[in-house]
């Protein structure tokens, strides 16, 4: 099963919820050319792990592990039986700490794979309700939408009929830590009401219109704090690249 990456075309921070989590308004688009892959494979006879992930990257504290534990509360017997014979193979292609939602997409694909393999018969809303307990971007990947306006803490998804130009991607070898970038944003001067007003305009426009008519700093509130924390990102800000998420992946319209 393929776990596709996403890009944020705009990302405006508009306040905090009761937990002090950031509220956002954003346009997410699915990137069908950038994906991880998940599959069930036969378990090695000498493996002693109850749930084993075989991967080309370090999996400790992985969000998939958390999804497994959450599902185990309701489907412990089914999961134990399956993973007594199978391991989960995860092939990572999506850059890590790059603003492309790789971990969230992997988690969504794992939930979908378990729903299908074990015939759990969970509908989309039930899957989204589970995902809210795991992470903020997972709901978009569960939806299957190619483009959506996303709000709240990432759990409110509205499909958007979009016009998406070809994008040319650059993946700097810089690991941008999401929490650190958000914390840097919080140290600055911001106007949540202004951000929300801008977002209400942006969410009505196509991706093509947004990238043609607005500056990179206008579209993504995290670009300036990202460049402050990671000075090598400043050149991309100055050269009119657009930033996805909290970085470090950047893009331009491929003209």
UniProtKB/Swiss-Prot annotation:
- EC number(s) on file: 2.7.1.148
Give the pathway annotation: Isoprenoid biosynthesis; isopentenyl diphosphate biosynthesis via DXP pathway; isopentenyl diphosphate from 1-deoxy-D-xylulose 5-phosphate: step 3/6
Q: Which reaction does it catalyse?
A: 4-CDP-2-C-methyl-D-erythritol + ATP = 4-CDP-2-C-methyl-D-erythritol 2-phosphate + ADP + H(+)
Under the heading Pfam families, the entry gives: GHMP_kinases_N
- Assigned keywords, A-Z: ATP-binding, Isoprene biosynthesis, Kinase, Nucleotide-binding, Transferase
Secreted as a keyword of this entry, yes or no, is no
User: EC top class, in one word?
Assistant: transferase
What's this protein's name?
Answer: 4-diphosphocytidyl-2-C-methyl-D-erythritol kinase
Its gene is: ispE
């Amino acid at each position: 099963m393929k776990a596709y990456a996403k890009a944020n075309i705009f990302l405006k921070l508009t306040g905090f919820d009761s937990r002090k989590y950031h509220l956002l308004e954003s346009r997410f688009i699915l990137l069908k050319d950038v994906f991880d892959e998940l599959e069930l494979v036969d378990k090695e006879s000498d493996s002693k792990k109850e749930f084993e992930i075989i991967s080309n990257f370090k999996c400790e504290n992985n969000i998939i592990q958390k999804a497994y534990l959450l599902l185990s509360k309701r489907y412990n017997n089914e999961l134990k039986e399956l993973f007594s014979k199978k391991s989960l193979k995860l092939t990572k292609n999506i850059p890590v700490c790059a603003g492309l939602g790789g971990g969230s997409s992997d988690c969504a694909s794992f939930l979908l794979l378990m729903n299908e393999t074990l015939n759990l018969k969970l509908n989309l809303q039930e899957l989204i309700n589970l995902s809210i307990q795991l992470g903020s971007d997972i709901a978009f990947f569960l939806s299957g939408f190619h483009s959506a306006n996303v709000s709240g803490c990432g759990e409110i998804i509205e499909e958007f009929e979009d016009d998406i130009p070809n994008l040319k991607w650059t993946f700097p070898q810089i690991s941008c830590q999401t929490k650190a970038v958000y914390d840097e944003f919080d140290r600055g001067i911001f106007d949540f009401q202004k951000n929300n007003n801008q977002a209400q305009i942006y969410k009505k426009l196509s991706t093509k219109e947004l990238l043609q008519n607005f500056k990179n700093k206008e579209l993504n509130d995290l670009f300036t704090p990202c460049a402050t924390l990671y000075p090598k990102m400043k050149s991309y800000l100055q050269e009119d690249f657009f930033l996805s998420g909290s970085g470090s992946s950047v893009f331009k319209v491929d003209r």
